[in-house]
Amino acid sequence: MKFNPFLEAIKTYESGKDMDLVAKEYGLKEVIKLASNENPYGTSKKAKEAIINNAHLAHLYPDDTMSELKQALAQKYDILKENLIIGSGSDQIIEYIVHAKLDHSKAYLQCGVSFAMYEIYAKQLGVKVYKTPSLTHDLNELYELYQKHKNEIKVIFLCLPNNPLGECLDASAVFEFLEKIDEDCLVAIDGAYNEFASFKDSKKHINPKELIHKFQNAVYLGTFSKLYGLGGMRVGYGIACKEIINAFYKLRAPFNVTNLSLKAAVAALDDDEFVQKTLENNFSQMKLYEDFAKNYKIRYIPSYTNFITYFFDEKNSTDLSEKLLKNGIIIRNLQSYGLNAVRISIGTEYENSRFFEEFSKNF
């Protein structure tokens, strides 16, 4: 059977391994997952209650206007509901961006290593990809490539902070960069981890309201999968001017987010105590990972997220990941990104201590 020839160039996305499957495969009683940047403290109490209290609605299609969640997000960011689109994870908004602006005659731009789904969605359409020589975001390199290929480049993805490396740019530098980009080039600011960056350093905070008011060609992406502990519910959103949102709606399938997911997201936005606890614990535990890396002379990039990436010179990241896996610790090997590195999600105090214990045995 023949398929779209563009598919030959696509590598399937490598997701984190399932804990139950790992336990069965290796005969383990305990498995700790530090691979997918999920919230180690689970789901907020308010979100759980919303799921339970609305479970009886599971047989009904959701409100396709998603009015309640849009209103909550509009209030959070001080924007209009018309500036919002809700997706099944922010991945779906990335898909809308690619389909709205790109085809096989066009290109998009990103830094050397960034979220894999940008490239996967683009290559589905045969879109050309331009990447900077530097792995992390270098705005000078990005602008140089943009200037050289601006007739082709119609989308720029900035992942701030960057997944899977963890670095982040100051918001002021990002806004200066946007000033130099043509209005017909859509710039996507992927803020999946921006709440973490904003907590660590206010200079990294991207204000979506300010962004879309200053730049009619910008879209901000947010998610409930990380800080808000709803990775299993699949809820993300895009914030942009009405013209962009209206274009995305032409690509959206009806009822794309479930009843329970919408209710859980609204409740999660109202749980400030859970959010604050997550942020504070994340960065207190992050310090332990930084100290651990220094002790073992492991290279890392200071992270503004809920994960840290270790880079190796001699040790093989695949071998290390497999050894840890057999001992019940799941981390993300970054060989699929062309890196001899591993990404480790920041867990609970106990989970992190178990990682340090097993890593020390196998390094």
Swiss-Prot record:
An annotated GO BP: L-histidine biosynthetic process
Protein keywords: Amino-acid biosynthesis, Aminotransferase, Histidine biosynthesis, Pyridoxal phosphate, Transferase
Catalyzed reaction equations: L-histidinol phosphate + 2-oxoglutarate = 3-(imidazol-4-yl)-2-oxopropyl phosphate + L-glutamate
Pathway involvement of the protein, from the record: Amino-acid biosynthesis; L-histidine biosynthesis; L-histidine from 5-phospho-alpha-D-ribose 1-diphosphate: step 7/9
InterPro entries to which the protein is assigned, alphabetical: Aminotransferase_I/II_large, HisP_aminotrans, HistidinolP_aminotransfase, PyrdxlP-dep_Trfase, PyrdxlP-dep_Trfase_major, PyrdxlP-dep_Trfase_small
SUPFAM superfamilies xrefs: PLP-dependent transferases (SSF53383)
UniProt keyword annotation of Endoplasmic reticulum present: no
Cofactor: pyridoxal 5'-phosphate
Sequence positions bearing N6-(pyridoxal phosphate)lysine: K226
Key word Ribonucleoprotein present: no
Enzyme type, top EC level: transferase
A single GO molecular function term of this UniProt record: histidinol-phosphate transaminase activity
Entry EC number(s): 2.6.1.9
NCBIfam families the UniProt entry points to: hisC (TIGR01141)
Subunit structure: Homodimer.
Protein family according to the UniProt entry: Belongs to the class-II pyridoxal-phosphate-dependent aminotransferase family. Histidinol-phosphate aminotransferase subfamily.
Protein name: Histidinol-phosphate aminotransferase
Record gene name: hisC
